[in-house]
Design a protein with these regions (language model features):
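N-terminal helix-loop segment corresponding to the beta1-alpha1 unit
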Residues: 1-132
Length: 132
């Protein structure tokens, strides 16, 4: 039965997902993640690579517990170049790609962002395709 406090976009996006909350800044949270990684096929993270390094969760760290794991980073900018290491979020990526300019109404003076978290969704689709 649908929970009336949950919107249809949330329900559509998160259908059949399972999740766990871990505080990776604590030894227990990190140990739990490494325990889960032992039997995982893929680990997808969406933190900056520097954060994963500080947490001791680089590819090399995960490979020690599971040599076959596929380690995928979904972060805003590449690891090289002028924006390397900078944080990003959907509105920023939309703006840098010119989406607000492309989607603004004719004659409007103010750009209009896509009403969905479009960049985040596209990244998810691209990751799924790359992994498979």
């Amino acid at each position: 039965m649908r929970n009336p406090s949950m919107g249809h976009i949330f329900l559509t996006t998160n259908r059949a997902k399972r999740s766990v909350v871990l505080n990776l800044k604590t030894p227990g949270g990190r140990d739990t993640l490494l325990h889960l990684a032992r039997t995982a096929d893929v680990l997808v993270y969406n933190l900056r690579p520097q954060a994963m390094q500080r947490l001791g969760l680089r590819y090399e760290d995960l490979r020690e517990v599971n040599p076959r794991i596929i380690y995928v980073g979904a972060f805003g900018f590449s690891q090289r170049g002028p924006y390397a290491g900078k944080p990003a979020y959907d509105d920023l990526i939309q703006g840098m790609c010119g989406i607000p300019w492309l989607t603004q109404q004719a004659g409007a003076e103010v750009p209009r962002y896509a009403p969905l978290i479009i960049a985040d969704r596209i990244v998810g689709l691209q990751l799924a395709g790359a992994i498979s």
